[in-house]
Design a protein with these regions (language model features):
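Short glycine-rich or small-residue beta-strand-to-loop segments that form or flank ligand, phosphate
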Residues: 8-15, 71-76, 101-104, 169-172, ...
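Short glycine/serine/threonine-rich phosphate/pyrophosphate-binding segments
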Residues: 18-28, 50, 84-85, 101-115, ...
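N-terminal phosphate-binding or glycine-rich loops at protein starts, especially the Walker A/P-loop
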Residues: 2-50
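Glycine-rich oxoanion-binding loops at beta->alpha junctions
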Residues: 2-3, 49-102, 109-110, 142-149, ...
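Phosphate-binding loop/pocket of nucleotide- and phosphate-handling active sites
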Residues: 244, 288-325
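Accessory alpha-helical/coil subdomains and C-terminal extensions
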Residues: 104-106, 116, 123, 144-247, ...
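Short, ordered loop/turn segments at secondary-structure junctions
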Residues: 14-17, 37, 42-47, 77-78, ...
């Protein structure tokens, strides 16, 4: 591999925000500065890159950020990055600002942008930042742990009042295409039913029958965790109440799941991944994605990472069903 001289590193956050992104940014900045490099922050993701919203970052610029949710660099989408012209323009801007290596924090869509920039000569490293846990090359993504805990605490509160009023509660969590958040919340909150986007053919009649059976067994509530990809929570609540006679309410947690101070796990894992991204660039690696598997931090070719498929672990789903007696 030809030696790649890295003097200046850029960092951006792209797509939806996730708690822990600031910890990753902080780690990139301070690791790079500690190794004698310059760091440039790109505001508002690829949109900011194309608009040349590029600033120098110092160690003080990332002080008091590790505990903050969201992203201090802000984030946005830009359709222009899907075009060859947009990709070439972005690569040219990186060269104009002397950005020898670029760390991209985001999900699959963000990685596709990094992949294209790599094709045009920009050394890129991707860090998995998404609350959906839907990146196949890694068992962990920045923000997932915080989002699960945020949702879990909210669902606990709904469960309290659901039990008091002997209600059925449908709680909708995020996850348009992936049901990991719903699955983990379902297990953590002891839900009676989990509806996943991977299982579109769920049987509402079976849910109604199960609610009736649970009431006969003396259960005072019935909790359904519904992933965003299934949706229709409000109408579902009306139908279930009509069929069972049990008061049913729907709660949509929405964007609160993306906010909040990151957990210790998200802070630590994001910090290690951010530092590793800088080290990989200094080793001459490019077009890579950092991941976490089997207790180790590893890196994958970005093309291989994007080609991987990730499904819901059946054993975990089965356990959730077994425990919902």
């Amino acid at each position: 591999m030809a030696e790649k001289i890295i003097r200046t590193i850029g960092v951006l956050t792209s797509g939806e925000d996730a708690p822990g992104m600031n910890a990753a940014i902080r780690a990139v900045v301070r690791t790079a500065l500690g190794k004698g490099l310059k760091v440039r922050g790109i505001r508002r993701g690829y949109s900011g890159l194309l608009n040349e919203e590029i600033i120098d970052l110092s160690a003080r610029d990332v002080s008091d950020t590790i505990q903050r949710g969201g992203t201090i660099l802000q984030t946005a989408r830009r359709e222009e990055m899907r075009t060859v012209e947009g990709q070439q323009k972005a690569a040219a801007i990186c060269k104009k600002y002397g950005i020898d290596g670029l760390v991209v924090i985001g999900g699959d869509g963000s990685f596709k942008g990094a992949q294209k920039l790599s094709d045009y000569g920009v050394n890129t490293i991707g860090l998995p930042g998404t609350i959906d846990l839907d990146i196949a090359c890694t068992e962990y993504t920045i923000g997932f742990d915080t989002a699960v805990n945020t949702a879990m605490e909210a669902i606990d509160k709904v469960r309290d009042t659901s039990t008091s009023h002997e209600r059925c509660s449908i709680i909708e969590v995020m996850g348009r295409d992936a049901g990991y958040l719903a699955l983990w919340c379902g297990i953590a909150n002891g839900a009676e039913r989990i509806l996943l986007p991977e299982e579109h053919d769920y049987n509402e009649e079976k849910i109604v029958a199960d609610i009736k059976e649970n009431r006969k067994r003396g259960k005072k509530h019935y909790i359904i965790i519904n992933a965003e990809g299934i949706g229709d929570s409000m109408n579902m609540a009306k139908r279930i109440e009509e069929e069972t006679g049990m008061e049913t309410r729907a709660t949509i947690l929405g964007h609160m799941q993306r906010g909040g101070s990151p957990t210790a796990k998200d802070r630590v894992y994001a910090s290690i991944m951010g530092a590793m991204a800088v080290d990989l660039l200094l080793e001459g690696k490019t077009n890579r994605v950092v991941g976490y598997k089997h207790g180790e931090y590893i890196d994958f070719d970005i093309n291989e990472a994007l080609a991987m498929q990730k499904g819901i672990p059946q054993y975990q789903y089965d356990i959730a069903q077994q425990l919902a007696l």
